[in-house]
Amino acid sequence: MARIAGVDIPREKRIVISLTYIYGIGKTKAQEILKAANVSEETRTRDLTEDELNRIREAIDGIKVEGDLRREVSLNIKRLIEIGAYRGIRHRRSLPVRGQNTKNNSRTRKGPRRTVANKKK
């Protein structure tokens, strides 16, 4: 397995797909990286030369990926919570942040249902 940005990428897949195993790189970003590194998208990871791998690594060095990106996202969320922004409050309460309805749906964000007991009459 080739190791790029601290991640072992699969050998048998096309390089454009293999790069998406790195957090922060999707298919479009992978295509841009390969274009900048002058490497064909159809090449399998196992067929890459050391020179091509180094060019890909150099192209990725300019992009925030993996740990740096995860840290930035978590710091952004922490900042929203600290300043008391509406989005920060939604994060703190584990509710949807982007304005979705919560009466019936949003189970992914809220977690399993917690049944509320009825008052005795």
UniProtKB/Swiss-Prot annotation:
Q: Decide whether keyword tRNA-binding is in the record.
A: yes
Q: Which PROSITE patterns does the entry link to? A: RIBOSOMAL_S13_1, RIBOSOMAL_S13_2
Q: Name one GO biological process term.
A: translation
- Does this entry carry the keyword Ribonucleoprotein? yes
Which Gene Ontology cellular component annotation is one that this UniProt entry carries?
A: cytosol
GO MF terms on file?
Answer: rRNA binding; structural constituent of ribosome; tRNA binding
Cite the residue spans of the region called Disordered: 94-121
Q: Which residue windows does the record flag with biased composition (Basic residues)?
A: 106-121
Q: Which UniProt keywords apply?
A: Ribonucleoprotein, Ribosomal protein, RNA-binding, rRNA-binding, tRNA-binding
What this chain does, per the entry, is described as: Located at the top of the head of the 30S subunit, it contacts several helices of the 16S rRNA. In the 70S ribosome it contacts the 23S rRNA (bridge B1a) and protein L5 of the 50S subunit (bridge B1b), connecting the 2 subunits; these bridges are implicated in subunit movement. Contacts the tRNAs in the A and P-sites.
Stored PANTHER family: 30S RIBOSOMAL PROTEIN S13/40S RIBOSOMAL PROTEIN S18, SMALL RIBOSOMAL SUBUNIT PROTEIN US13M
Similarity comment: family membership? Belongs to the universal ribosomal protein uS13 family.
UniProt cross-references to NCBIfam families, sorted A to Z: uS13_bact
Assembly, in brief, is: Part of the 30S ribosomal subunit. Forms a loose heterodimer with protein S19. Forms two bridges to the 50S subunit in the 70S ribosome.
How is this protein named in the record? Small ribosomal subunit protein uS13
Q: What is the lineage of its organism?
A: Bacteria, Bacillati, Bacillota, Bacilli, Bacillales
